[in-house]
Amino acid sequence: MKTACLISTGTELLLGTTNDSNSVFLATRLLERGIKVIGKTVVGDSRETIKMAFASSLGLADMVISSGGLGPTRDDLTKEVACQVMGCEMVINQAEVKRLEDFFARRQRPMPESNLKQALFPAEAEIIFNPLGTAPGMYLKKDNKVLILLPGPPREMEYMFKNEIETRLERDFPQALNRVTRKTIKILGPGESQLEKILDGVIDDSPELSMALLAVDGEIHIKLTADGQDINHSKELMEKACQSIKEALGRNIVGYDNDTLLSVVAACLANTGKKIAVAESCTGGLLAKMITDLSGSSEYFWGSVTSYSNEAKMLYLNVKRETLEQYGAVSPEVAREMAQGMQKQSGTDLALSITGIAGPDGGTKDKPVGLVYICLADGGFLQVKEMHFVGNRESIRILAAKTALDLLRRHLKNGG
């Protein structure tokens, strides 16, 4: 697999006043094309640190892609320093001078003399046209290395990468780009450490297959990349790995690639023809919001009750006063009565209820912040799940709602 290092230049990136979205975009696009990013560096507008970054990156990877530092001002040093490291002499490119002059003429503005530095390039470099700004990019192949320089503004950088750089990568690295396959497996249930233990030894240790675990909003995404001798070999490696993971994780697998927990639950409900209603306390309507985020949810979603107070639980869900007084609002007993009451009020096949303590206040030694009870009712069947979530108020609410959806998914997948 071909490798790349990314360099982002700009003091504003180091100070944290600007997010480095360019590196995220580039790493994603490169991996999709079978090029592995093995390093990323963020440097300020300092000649020495920029020089060290390019020297180090060129020593590590097959290609180096830089964004930023191609403007006309004194602190725009990227191109000059990178070309010094590559041992290339820069000369004025008259075609670029003409383009810059036309750019300013169309805007009825005189071209500052400082902009001429943007027309300096090594004679052997391919100049990358920038229709959205004054800073052109550069693509240079030398000594089995590729140097790519792109402007810092994300809109300009992304346009140039998609329309100019990717065609050159396909030209220069056709074998790398055409033999890689990728798959994302989405998991809910085991945590990252537990999942790593489960998967230990499941996939053969091979340089042709890589696996990474990524935590995403309560889920764990397993990112698989197969880089075999050719595309067929890569597909075989991927199929074998996916089958091994499926056997190890079973129902913990929510879906693959573009699948979402909600889309999988929606498909299960559509297949069974069942309708659902939800009763929420600590999530404050978030579960209902998640369900209705998907177009067409009226086919299977009856509605919801947000019963935040004890009075609302009694009035709208028929939760008994004695149950609340004896066990408290956050209890498996109340979760059951909420689900049963919601099912009775709506007449639906299924009902979900959530009651808990999202924090930051309200917790006790016996019932700490993060304690949540979720109940699923299906006819006479009742299942209560006790969860202990860790995080702030928002994350606890999100985890509670997603766990409720996952409880429903597992029930429907098991024939419920």
From Swiss-Prot:
It holds the Pfam family MoCF_biosynth. InterPro entries: CinA, CinA-like_C, CinA_C, CinA_KH, Competence-induced_CinA, MoaB/Mog-like_dom_sf, MoaB/Mog_dom. Transmembrane segments: none annotated. Gene3D superfamilies: 3.30.70.2860, CinA-like, MoaB/Mog-like domain. Belongs to the CinA family. NCBIfam families: cinA_nterm, PncC_domain, PRK00549.1. HAMAP family: CinA_B. This is CinA-like protein. The lineage of its organism: Bacteria, Bacillati, Bacillota, Clostridia, Eubacteriales.
